[in-house]
Amino acid sequence: MYVAHLSLHDFRSYATAEVELSPGVTAFIGRNGQGKTNLVEAIDYLSRLSSHRVASDAPLVRAGADQAVVRAAVVRDGRTAVLEVELNPGRSNRARVNRSPLPRARDLVGLVRTVVFSPEDLTLVKGDPADRRRFLDDLLVLRVPRLAGVRADYDRVLRQRNTLLKTARKGGFARKGGFARKGGFAPLGPPEGRPEGPPEGRTGGSATSGPPSRSVALDTLAVWDAHLARTGAELLAERLALVEALRPYVGKAYETVARGATRDDAEIDYKPSFDLEGRTGRDDLVEALLAEVERRRGDELDRGVSLVGPHRDELLLTLGHGSPDSRLPVKGYASHGESWSFALALRLAAYDLLRADGDDPILILDDVFAELDTERRAQLADLVAGAEQVLVTAAVAADVPAGLAGARFAVGNGEVLREQ
């Protein structure tokens, strides 16, 4: 798989850009702020419909423009398809394949696959659990594109349920009074000093007219519990399976990247927000999630937030030998070099797993060599040199290892010029 042509309109710093590409290694060389990363970011966006640099689409649209367009001719198994996404901040994005509109923009996900190495990768090791969950989910969606819908459904359910919990909390639900019951909750009596029913001057139960009655709120919460368990169980089951598939690749990649620098083994383990007691099947996980939600009901009502589900899980990264209890967490214990080696191992493992699935994803090395010492630069270059397409960005040509010789573009002053 490789990108043969990239076309940008009002994307980041580019009013327009047209770049012809080829298989093998291509390096974009330019000073910081000249737009070299914007080029590879656009290709990665087509892969995941999200940026590895920012959380929202708004910064991706050039200042003063209403929308941005990214279009690429992608060659896969000898066939060329033109993929296009139209970014509309505040509105729905639109996607096309060979100029034919897709029902939903997310249907574009997975048609081109990328693996990005960037300076931000250190957050996979040193950042919050959310960074590691995103790493897993992005890889899940690349392998099984329909899971983009599952993840979107879970996020929607979580937002709705949190809103309802906050409403219930403001409405005066309390721990005492025996609120829990199987399949839902018994409504409590009014808080001390407050009459039963909606606040004075308000009627009904919409979000705009005031909080719903307690029985309505609790019955509605039971419905969202079921949605949370259903979508959460599917996402959780897929993550568990992914970690099992990824684990041997991480260990092998770390051993290669940190060659001679350590005798420790790199391990990854999935840590759910509660004890699964060995359950991994979807139906069993649905029951487990529902039971845990019921057990934590009081805490959730007290805090007004969902405390159970995949959004609270963690991907544990450890170094050492033996059982998980005998290994040390990378975050907080590993040196800077070990942390970088682990971050690179995660990306390399993702690349190797996608290749094992039968696809050779596009590798993007975004300013990553400037962060590595000479030995790690050479090791990484050796590992990725055989990929069908490798896109590299660097501030100076000297940052690109000799093992990654190939086409080069000079990027500056809004232009992308191929060097002869």
From Swiss-Prot:
GO terms (BP aspect): DNA replication; DNA synthesis involved in DNA repair; double-strand break repair; SOS response
Binding site for ATP: G30, R31, N32, G33, Q34, G35, K36, T37
Keywords for the protein's UniProt record, in alphabetical order: ATP-binding, Cytoplasm, DNA damage, DNA repair, DNA replication, DNA-binding, Nucleotide-binding, SOS response
Domain of life: Bacteria
Region entry Disordered, spans: 175-214
Primary location group: cytoplasm
CC annotations in GO: cytoplasm
GO molecular function: ATP binding; single-stranded DNA binding
Compartments reported by the entry: Cytoplasm
Functional note: The RecF protein is involved in DNA metabolism; it is required for DNA replication and normal SOS inducibility. RecF binds preferentially to single-stranded, linear DNA. It also seems to bind ATP.
Similarity section: Belongs to the RecF family.
Name of this protein: DNA replication and repair protein RecF
Organism: Nocardioides sp. (strain ATCC BAA-499 / JS614)
Organism ancestry: Bacteria, Bacillati, Actinomycetota, Actinomycetes, Propionibacteriales
